């Protein structure tokens, strides 16, 4: 909040009971990430309605998008990632991700150049290297080291889909 104040930006901090809810709902061995994300999104939707916001901008960058693609592919059996623009299921909210085409390393360099702090994740699970997202993040780092540009290639693939070459019959064109 200090950075926002110093720059004259409005900042709203909302304290929630998400941690308590998660402790009551999840088993000890459960990964909290998807439930936490849904609960936080619910808070954002509610706040957007309260202040009359027409869009909710999230800070997901290209690495987040690619990691989500691989997590869904490997562990959920879905071919989906994070769109740059998403309308909520009820049509009342529009989520935008203006940094979705920016790699994490580029976002960090820009923030540093602008004198903006890099705020680390405050989630206790975030540093757990055994979590699937952390493992996928390491996999991508290794791939990028061995094959520079592979992350950009994966990001490009998300904009260049050939539905007829996938197994989903809903994407097949009838002759």
Regions found by a protein language model. Name each.
Residues 36-47, 85-90, 140-158:
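Short, basic, helix/turn surface patches
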Residues 1-71, 75, 105-113:
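ATP-dependent adenylation/nucleotidyltransferase module used to activate substrates
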Residues 12-26, 50-59, 92-103, 121, ...:
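Hydrophobic transmembrane alpha-helix bundles
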Residues 116-175:
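The feature marks non-catalytic terminal segments
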Residues 18, 56, 63-135, 139-142:
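Catalytic subdomain that performs nucleotidyl-dependent activation
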Residues 2-7, 14, 38-41, 80, ...:
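Arginine residue identity/basic-tract feature
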